[in-house]
């Protein structure tokens, strides 16, 4: 897997979690610093990605980077690289593009930092599916939300996914937007999409709100 660069986006505003914590009168912590079995969410996501066998793992920071850097400082792995958005107030596509521009590989594994419940096994499946596809340079292997296998629509889809760097370089510079509209544009313009099934329902969960965090904790407790 040395030909794979992982990009983890960790540059968002954390707006919904901040509001949830305020409403619940819980002391503020960045959602990526909340802990799962004593491990910060961000660290767990990074560990799952590194264990998938990638050659490098780029974490792209923007908003609230000062809160996340101490977590990253605790990770001792030469494959980990920290990238900073030049402008913090950008869309997700621009954060992802900043990561792509700093990669050293032909293929990219793209993951959101608030997806600690996506297992290493599922991430490996995304990579294996891409590399073994008939057209790896024109294919996106993506965690399926509804349909699995060959996809005709990107509705509801987002990270994690794996694809050739050139696909991202073709589409990301064209639109400063959230990711799903760009994925839908890719599929309209002939990029092949293959939906990989999840192993557990919780893998489909991004930790955006405090209830999401509690669901992840409950799932892990019952494992």
Short names for language-model regions:
Residues 1, 41-107, 120-121, 172-174:
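Conserved N-terminal catalytic core of the sugar/cofactor nucleotidyltransferase
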Residues 22-44:
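Short catalytic helix/loop segments, enriched in acidic residues and glycine
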């Amino acid at each position: 897997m040395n030909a794979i660069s992982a990009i983890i986006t960790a540059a968002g505003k954390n707006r919904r979690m901040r509001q949830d914590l305020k409403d619940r009168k819980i002391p503020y912590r960045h959602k990526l610093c909340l802990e799962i079995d004593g491990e910060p969410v961000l660290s767990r996501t990074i560990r799952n990605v590194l264990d998938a066998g990638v050659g490098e793992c780029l974490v792209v920071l923007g908003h609230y980077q000062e809160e996340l850097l101490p977590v990253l400082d605790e990770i001792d792995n030469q494959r980990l690289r920290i990238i900073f958005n030049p402008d913090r107030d950008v869309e997700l596509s621009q954060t992802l593009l900043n990561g792509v521009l700093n990669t050293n590989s032909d293929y990219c594994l793209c993951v959101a930092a608030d997806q600690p419940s996506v297992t290493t096994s599922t991430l490996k499946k995304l990579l294996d599916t891409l590399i073994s596809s008939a057209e790896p340079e024109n294919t996106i292997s993506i965690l399926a939300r509804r349909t699995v296998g060959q996809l005709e629509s990107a509705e509801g889809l987002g990270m994690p996914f794996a694809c050739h760097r050139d696909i991202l370089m073709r589409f990301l510079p064209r639109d400063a937007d959230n990711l799903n509209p760009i994925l839908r544009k890719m599929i309209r313009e002939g990029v092949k999409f293959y939906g990989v099934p999840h192993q557990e329902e919780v893998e489909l969960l991004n930790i955006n709100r405090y209830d999401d965090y509690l669901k992840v904790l409950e799932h892990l407790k019952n494992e």
